[in-house]
């Protein structure tokens, strides 16, 4: 570093003799200090090359995925996935035999489209991609980690996007909700993700009474109400309360049995109300009269 300092001072002063005595600095050191290495799109391409290389080890592919995801947290880099034609290879990893790679691919998809309408639209250009993620979320044979990441990806794909939400519904997305919410062995995190996905769809589609009836018919409402209990995770309770508020706002009319169950379950939440979202709690309280 001292050598670099002497060289830079002499060079700035135009003292060729002093600069020569100091000696030329290490090019690698200059690159580290002042940049000039591979640009981020090139790093993205290199990472994907490792991921797609059949000779690369799984560990090396996981490192490449970590690097790729870190890069596409930047909005411009996320949008460059389409420009660099990297969506197709990324989506193909959803069918990898390696569970960890499927999980990483889902995580990258979810991060790339998060609050990014352009990347959402780019993802939707790929036929069958939505269906693949829905199936990963649906499969009981998949690990909890993969399924939870699938719900994460789906939530970010549909959020504030009417076309994506409609495609999700058309591909049978609503049918995966009730089984996840009812299954006793399903982790709380996945249930929270599932309800977050459902509320994103409801909001994006500006759901009407007919859509809310669909939620009832598919047993999603029934499965959700099972989690209105003081022993449940507060975040899970919040999601259910928010679902009720959204359904009411869409014009849904709850029947006598439903109102009775909601009222009884809601009353049991009083001891934990300070842990819950105040707005949704009060909105449901007002709804019940």
Swiss-Prot record:
Cellular-component GO terms for this entry: cytosol; endoplasmic reticulum
Keyword GTP-binding tagged: no
Keyword Cytoplasm included in the entry's annotation: yes
Alphabetic keyword roster: Cytoplasm, Repeat, Translation regulation
ARM repeats: 13-56, 75-114, 118-159, 162-203, 222-267
Record-linked Pfam families: Fes1
Any GO BP: cytoplasm protein quality control by the ubiquitin-proteasome system
Record's subcellular location: Cytoplasm
Top-level taxonomic group: Eukaryota
MF GO annotations: adenyl-nucleotide exchange factor activity
InterPro entries: ARM-like, ARM-type_fold, Armadillo, Hsp70_NEF-Inhibitors, Nucleotide_exch_fac_Fes1
The family this protein is said to belong to: Belongs to the FES1 family.
PANTHER family in alphabetical order: HSP70-BINDING PROTEIN 1, PROTEIN FOLDING REGULATOR
Functional summary from the UniProt entry: Functions as a nucleotide exchange factor (NEF) for Hsp70 chaperones which accelerates the release of ADP. Required for fully efficient Hsp70-mediated folding of proteins.
Name this protein carries in UniProt: Hsp70 nucleotide exchange factor FES1
Organism of provenance: Eremothecium gossypii (strain ATCC 10895 / CBS 109.51 / FGSC 9923 / NRRL Y-1056)
């Amino acid at each position: 570093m001292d050598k670099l300092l002497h060289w830079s001072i002499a060079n700035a002063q135009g003292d060729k003799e002093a600069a020569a005595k100091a000696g030329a600095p290490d090019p690698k050191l200059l690159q580290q200090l002042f940049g000039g290495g591979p640009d981020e799109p090139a790093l993205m391409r290199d990472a994907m090359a490792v991921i797609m290389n059949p000779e690369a080890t799984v560990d090396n592919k996981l490192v490449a995925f970590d690097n790729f995801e870190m890069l596409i947290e930047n909005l411009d880099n996320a949008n460059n996935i389409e420009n660099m034609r990297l969506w197709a290879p990324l989506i193909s990893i959803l069918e990898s035999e390696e569970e960890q790679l499927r999980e990483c691919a889902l995580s990258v998809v979810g991060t790339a489209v998060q609050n990014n309408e352009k990347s959402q639209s780019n993802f939707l250009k790929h036929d069958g991609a939505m269906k693949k993620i829905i199936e990963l979320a649906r499969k009981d044979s998949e690990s909890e980690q993969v399924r939870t990441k699938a719900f994460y990806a789906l939530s970010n794909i549909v959020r504030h996007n009417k076309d994506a939400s409609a495609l999700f519904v058309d591909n049978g997305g609503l049918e995966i909700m009730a089984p996840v919410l009812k299954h006793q062995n399903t982790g709380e995190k996945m249930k929270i993700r599932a309800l977050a996905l459902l509320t994103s769809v409801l909001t994006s589609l500006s759901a009407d009474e007919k859509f809310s009836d669909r939620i009832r018919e598919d047993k999603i409402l029934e499965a959700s109400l099972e989690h209105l209990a003081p022993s449940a995770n507060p975040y899970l309770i919040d999601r259910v309360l928010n679902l009720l508020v959204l359904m009411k706002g869409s014009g849904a009319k709850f029947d006598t049995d439903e109102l009775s169950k909601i009222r009884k379950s809601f009353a049991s939440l009083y001891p934990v109300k300070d842990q819950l979202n105040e707005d949704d709690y009060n909105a449901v309280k007002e709804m019940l009269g």
